[in-house]
């Protein structure tokens, strides 16, 4: 609605400015009003960085009518905190007013000169620091008033939505662990990170929620694991392992087994996973997603989803669309995240029926790591020295690890 009003006003203004003689427009007085053209973008999104910096945005006043004003029109701009509640009620949000020390309305008055349609530019400075909260939207309503002309109420307020993100190359990270050995697979399970080493050992890195930190690696009983399993991946309260080279004894290549890791560190092998599809060496990656297991074909040309139906039976087999030639693929909420050889972090919405949504690039520079995976809401990267680095991830931001 706001955009339609502004388009109508601009069309009239354009017609008048191109005409050599006056044009009479019926009810022209109804279009003669002042407004903020930036208010057509609702909200007006201002993306800033978590830096000690000032980032400037511009607004102005505009006169819409069949003819330019015959006299100067004076307007004032002001911050109206009461409109934050109005915005939240209308949009179902709970945003807060941008703190007063985080903005500066450089000038609060402007003039639309006689014979003109636009005022001078008003600068709005958004002031951030390294302590500015990232990924937390704030609202800054700036409204216009004038005693010289009618104000078009629907476009009289621009709602700045200010959201800060980390600047490229300045994203904080924390080293949480050093892997004892090269990994075959690595995953989060039961509030810990587990490494399945290439030499067969299983290491556990426990997470302490009270201290928000990980403990040292502990080797757990790996009876029945060793090199007899190609991959391990968690799903719900269990860990799935794929047999390799006829191991465990008497099984075919690719047979799935179900494990549970007890508090004491003992692993139990349950019955073989029933309803096994014809797994073979053509799969090179196994990924858990909600109640399903995803298997990527060797090289990433395709990927299949097998629904477990919440039990130990593989059900529906769905071929996912697209190519999956990525260095890392992992589930994150209702999405699959991927990292390609260029380091781009990309989000693919995915349904439980296997429908893949359109990709969105949400990061770059992630080729710093040879593997990336999720732990709760955070992302973990494994560097070339097998160090684990943790990012307090938020899907609302863009995560550029390099400048």
Where are these regions (language model features)?
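C-terminal motif of bacterial Sec signal peptides marking the signal peptidase cleavage site
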Residues: 14-17
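Acidic/polar, low-complexity intrinsically disordered N-terminal segments immediately downstream
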Residues: 19-113, 117-121, 128-183
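Repeated scaffold domains used in trafficking and secretory/extracellular systems
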Residues: 174-190, 223-237, 272-291, 318-333, ...
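Short beta-strand elements that form the blades of beta-propeller/WD-repeat-like
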Residues: 185, 190-196, 237-243, 247-250, ...
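Short loop/turn segments that connect beta-strands within beta-propeller blades
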Residues: 207-211, 260-265, 307-311, 350-354, ...
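Structural motif
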Residues: 199-206, 245-259, 299-307, 342-349, ...
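A short beta-strand motif characteristic of beta-propeller blades
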Residues: 169-178, 213-223, 267-277, 312-322, ...
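An edge-strand/N-cap motif at the start of beta-rich repeat modules
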Residues: 159-209, 398-403
């Amino acid at each position: 609605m706001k955009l339609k009003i502004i388009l109508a006003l601009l069309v009239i203004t354009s017609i008048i400015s191109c005409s050599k003689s006056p044009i009479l427009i019926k009810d022209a007085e109804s279009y003669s009003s002042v407004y903020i053209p930036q208010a057509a973008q609702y909200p007006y999104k201002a993306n800033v960085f978590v830096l000690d910096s000032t980032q400037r945005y511009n607004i102005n006043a505009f006169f819409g009518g069949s003819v330019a004003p015959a006299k100067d029109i004076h307007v004032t701009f002001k911050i109206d905190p009461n409109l934050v509640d109005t915005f939240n009620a209308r949009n179902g949000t709970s945003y807060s007013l941008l703190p007063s020390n985080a903005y500066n309305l450089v000038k609060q008055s402007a003039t639309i000169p006689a014979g003109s349609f636009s005022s001078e530019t008003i600068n709005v400075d958004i002031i951030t620091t390294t302590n500015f909260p990232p990924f937390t939207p704030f609202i800054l309503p700036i409204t216009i008033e004038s005693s010289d002309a009618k104000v078009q109420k629907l476009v009289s307020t621009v709602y700045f939505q200010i959201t800060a993100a980390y600047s490229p190359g300045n994203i904080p990270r924390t080293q949480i662990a050093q892997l004892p050995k090269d990994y075959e697979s690595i995953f989060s399970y039961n509030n810990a990170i587990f490494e399945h080493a290439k030499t067969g050992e299983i290491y556990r890195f426990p997470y302490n929620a009270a201290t928000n930190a990980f403990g040292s690696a502990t080797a757990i009983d790996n009876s029945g694991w060793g090199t007899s399993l190609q991959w391990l991946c968690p799903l719900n309260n269990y860990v799935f392992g794929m047999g390799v080279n006829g191991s465990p004894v008497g099984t075919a290549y690719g047979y799935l087994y179900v494990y549970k890791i007890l508090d004491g560190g003992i692993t139990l092998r349950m019955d073989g996973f029933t309803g096994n599809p014809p797994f073979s060496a053509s799969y090179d990656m196994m990924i858990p997603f909600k109640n399903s297991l995803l298997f990527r074909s060797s090289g990433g040309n395709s990927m299949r989803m097998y629904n477990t139906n919440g039990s130990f039976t593989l059900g529906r087999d769905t071929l996912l669309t697209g190519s999956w030639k990525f260095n890392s693929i992992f589930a994150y909420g209702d999405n699959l995240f991927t990292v390609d050889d260029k380091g781009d972090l990309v989000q693919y919405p995915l349904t439980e029926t296997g429908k893949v949504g359109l990709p969105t690039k949400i990061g770059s520079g992630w080729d710093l790591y040879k593997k990336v995976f999720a732990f709760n809401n955070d992302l973990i990267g494994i560097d070339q020295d097998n160090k684990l680095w943790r990012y307090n991830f938020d899907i609302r931001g863009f995560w550029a690890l390099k400048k």
